[in-house]
A protein has these predicted regions:
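Phosphate/NTP-binding elements of NTP-utilizing enzymes
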Residues: 1-186
Length: 186
């Protein structure tokens, strides 16, 4: 099954209590798998039905979050899920003992172009998992946040490889969240 190191296990445990769950680190360091596993654990009990998974492209999201070389959502929920369409959107549809036989839908979308946000409009999402968030267009990031306003258990799981310290993902989001967290405003 899964053989996580202590640092990875501690991060996954902490995700239960945090709205924002963000991992930055080297390529192949396990960031995405940690977030996928934490996301899957929350998916089992969240009251929200529809969730969002994004990558720079839809293919990237499906490979890194859905498959993840045998560690993705389709493997965690094997025998309880199938790939398909949900309201014309690419989705992993989950329903089985892990979700107490309540249907959970994870919509997959690409996020790198300026009009990617149009694909996720019209839905409300509970949780959002994004891989390589630094490659997402700002329009999509803003729209994904807006689409979570009605969530019963709002959670965000992001991963990224290190970028230039002045990159927009830091200036517009990560540095802002860090400052708010230090002030107790998150």
């Amino acid at each position: 099954m899964f053989n996580f190191g202590e640092g990875h296990k501690e991060y996954i445990r902490r995700c239960r209590f945090c709205t924002f769950n963000i991992l930055e680190g080297a390529v192949r360091s396990g960031k995405t798998v940690d977030n996928v596993f934490a996301f899957a654990q929350e998916l089992k009990t969240t009251p929200d039905k529809i969730h969002l998974a994004t990558g720079s492209t839809m293919g990237n999201a499906k490979l890194n979050i859905g498959d993840a070389n045998g560690f993705g959502l389709e493997w965690i929920f094997r025998g309880q899920c199938h790939w398909g369409k949900y309201k014309d959107m690419e989705a992993l549809i989950i329903n089985g003992p892990y979700t107490n036989f309540k249907q959970k839908v994870v919509i997959f979308a690409g996020a790198s172009s300026s009009d990617s946000f149009k694909k996720i409009r019209g839905n409300s999402y509970g949780m959002w998992i994004a891989t390589e968030i630094n490659l997402h267009h700002d329009n999509t990031i803003k729209e994904a946040f807006n689409r979570q306003l009605a969530a019963k258990r709002r959670k965000i799981f992001w991963d990224l490889n290190p970028e230039h310290p002045k990159a927009p993902i830091y200036a517009n989001y990560l540095d802002v969240y860090e400052a708010k967290a230090k002030k107790g405003e998150l």
